[in-house]
């Protein structure tokens, strides 16, 4: 049997592995449900600190706008004053995903997303869609029901109350 070397002096060395396990992972994401590797808010909601000359928001301000990792490249391109190429070495490049955060960083909008934008995730067979405050999530058992569940993440960021009976899914997500 091989045990990883978790001595603090060896952190980051080959053979070291640091993790505090699922129960502490859940504690670290309180009040959200679940943690990394899941599509509940605890797995996809993150803190991000941004600083620099393009940030015009008040110091210490908190923004709760919906953002996605796919937004990073469009943001960096816009800050750099350049654009995403349509082709490279004579080959067409697929369109970039994501939206620039620059209008949000400059304090002109609260989110790069509108209420009609849809974000989608798939990870390890689990999947989720979000539009505005509504989130439709399917997660495998034992953490999920292996069925679609609808949540209002603005009113219930911990995803404790399934809203399937309150709002028809086709009225929420087109």
Model-inferred region functions:
Residues 159-163:
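Carboxylate-dense, calcium-coordinating segments in secreted/extracellular and ER-lumen proteins
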Residues 13-44, 55-65, 70-154, 158:
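C-terminal cap/loop subdomain of S1 sulfatases and analogous C-terminal strand-loop tails that border
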Residues 1-11, 43, 49:
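Metal-dependent active-site segment of extracytoplasmic phospho-/sulfohydrolases and closely related
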Residues 52:
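Conserved residues at the C-terminal ends of beta-strands
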Residues 62-63, 164-167:
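Short histidine-centered catalytic/ligand-binding loop motif
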Residues 168-174:
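Acidic, proline/serine/threonine- and glycine-rich low-complexity intrinsically disordered segments
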